[in-house]
């Protein structure tokens, strides 16, 4: 898991969020024999070409190849980048995250997960909950899961922050069975 804290705002550091995610994911994935490590900062300077000045956003797909190299460098099963910038993909105004199951990498943006983004007071607990949901969602894709029609399942597509707030941080029974099956395979 890679973090980025170079986005300057009055939102404060995301280190507590990264620590929370590392601890939670470490506990969740330990039962599948997967170790979760926080390996340091991801400099946005590597992604200057991904920035669209007209949109004031980064094209999310440009993070994935770099994460793939990091995954190889650490001989990891998967790599997750967490950034504090607004990201998008063509056809979408914004996205919370993007995964590439073939590369076994994903990126999640905290930018629109902050309650302050929506004019609400700061709430670190809510931010951590939202971040966990989006990270679990993208890692689900990394490990072979598609979107789920169950609005409470973490694999349900979030078209807005309301969708993220409605769903659970956990996989529904069907998605959890698929995840466990996929993680048991040696090639995943």
UniProtKB/Swiss-Prot annotation:
Cofactor comment text: Binds 2 Zn(2+) ions per subunit. One is catalytic, whereas the other seems to have a structural role.
Function: Probable zinc metalloprotease whose natural substrate is unknown.
Enzyme class: hydrolase
Pfam families: Peptidase_M54
Binding-site residues, Zn(2+) 2: 148, 153, 172, 175
Name used for this protein in its record: Archaemetzincin
Lineage of origin: Archaea, Methanobacteriati, Methanobacteriota, Thermococci, Thermococcales
Family designation: Belongs to the peptidase M54 family.
Highest taxon of the lineage: Archaea
Cofactors (names): Zn(2+)
Active site residues of this protein: 138
Keyword vocabulary terms for this entry: Hydrolase, Metal-binding, Metalloprotease, Protease, Zinc
The keyword Magnesium is assigned to this record: no
GO biological process, one term: proteolysis
Quaternary state and interactors: Monomer.
InterPro entries linked: MetalloPept_cat_dom_sf, Pept_M54_archaemetzincn, Pept_M54_archaemetzncn_arc/bac
Residues annotated for Zn(2+) 1 binding in this entry: 137, 141, 147
